[in-house]
Amino acid sequence: MDHTDDRKMYGTTILSIRRGNSVIVAGDGQVTLGSTIMKTSARKIKRLASNTVITGFAGATADAFTLFERLEGKLEKHPGQLMRACVELAKDWRQDKYLRRLEAMMIVADKSVSLVISGGGDVLEPENGIAAIGSGGNLALAAARALCAAQDEFAPAMPLEYIVAKSMAIAAEICIYTNNNIVMEKIEG
C-alpha cells in the first residue's frame, strides 16, 4: 500500500490465529493520515451475526464499514454459512462498479473457518490457521508462525492469547503504521 497520499488514511495490522477449537482475531488501534497519526485507539475488530463471527479490516475506514454492512446482510441471508456469505460478498465486491473502488481487506472468522477477503474478489482460507493483513501484516504473520511452531515443539501450554499479543507487539515494534493498542476477540468452538 502506498502511504504517500496525505489525503488517505492508512496503517493497521490485523492478525487471526486458529489453534485447536479456538480462534482469535486481533487488530491495533492506529490510524495514519499521510505521515500523521490521527488516532491511536481505533477499533478495527467487530463482531457480527449475533457475536458468532469476528471481522477485522485493513484499509480505508469508510470502505471497511461499507463492507461490514454488506457482509452482515449476506450473513442474514445465509445464516451459519460464513463461507457462502463471504463468497457472495466477494462476488458483489468484484462486480459492482461502486464496490470495486473500495480500498480494504478483511479477515473473517467463525467457530469453524477463517477467511481473508480481498477487493480483487479473492476468498482465501489460510493453510495453517494463521492470517494477517495490513501494513504490519507480514511482520505479525512471521512472528505468529514462529511462535506457533515453538508452541508445537517446546511449549504446548503457551496460551493462544500470548501468541497473538506477542505477534502483534513484534509488528508494532517494526511497523510505523501499527501501535500497541491491541483489541482481541475470541471464539471457542
From Swiss-Prot:
<keyword id="KW-0645">Protease</keyword>
<keyword id="KW-0479">Metal-binding</keyword>
<feature type="binding site">
    <location>
        <position position="178"/>
    </location>
    <ligand>
        <name>Na(+)</name>
    </ligand>
</feature>
<dbReference type="InterPro" id="IPR001353">
    <property type="entry name" value="Proteasome_sua/b"/>
</dbReference>
<dbReference type="Pfam" id="PF00227">
    <property type="entry name" value="Proteasome"/>
</dbReference>
<feature type="binding site">
    <location>
        <position position="172"/>
    </location>
    <ligand>
        <name>Na(+)</name>
    </ligand>
</feature>
<dbReference type="GO" id="GO:0051603">
    <property type="term" value="P:proteolysis involved in protein catabolic process"/>
</dbReference>
<comment type="similarity">
    <text>Belongs to the peptidase T1B family. HslV subfamily.</text>
</comment>
<dbReference type="GO" id="GO:0009376">
    <property type="term" value="C:HslUV protease complex"/>
</dbReference>
<keyword id="KW-0963">Cytoplasm</keyword>
<feature type="active site">
    <location>
        <position position="12"/>
    </location>
</feature>
<dbReference type="GO" id="GO:0005839">
    <property type="term" value="C:proteasome core complex"/>
</dbReference>
<dbReference type="InterPro" id="IPR029055">
    <property type="entry name" value="Ntn_hydrolases_N"/>
</dbReference>
<feature type="binding site">
    <location>
        <position position="175"/>
    </location>
    <ligand>
        <name>Na(+)</name>
    </ligand>
</feature>
<dbReference type="InterPro" id="IPR022281">
    <property type="entry name" value="ATP-dep_Prtase_HsIV_su"/>
</dbReference>
<keyword id="KW-0915">Sodium</keyword>
<keyword id="KW-0021">Allosteric enzyme</keyword>
<comment type="function">
    <text>Protease subunit of a proteasome-like degradation complex believed to be a general protein degrading machinery.</text>
</comment>
<dbReference type="InterPro" id="IPR023333">
    <property type="entry name" value="Proteasome_suB-type"/>
</dbReference>
<dbReference type="GO" id="GO:0004298">
    <property type="term" value="F:threonine-type endopeptidase activity"/>
</dbReference>
<keyword id="KW-0378">Hydrolase</keyword>
<dbReference type="GO" id="GO:0046872">
    <property type="term" value="F:metal ion binding"/>
</dbReference>
<protein>
    <recommendedName>
        <fullName>ATP-dependent protease subunit HslV</fullName>
        <ecNumber>3.4.25.2</ecNumber>
    </recommendedName>
</protein>
<comment type="subunit">
    <text>A double ring-shaped homohexamer of HslV is capped on each side by a ring-shaped HslU homohexamer. The assembly of the HslU/HslV complex is dependent on binding of ATP.</text>
</comment>
<keyword id="KW-0888">Threonine protease</keyword>
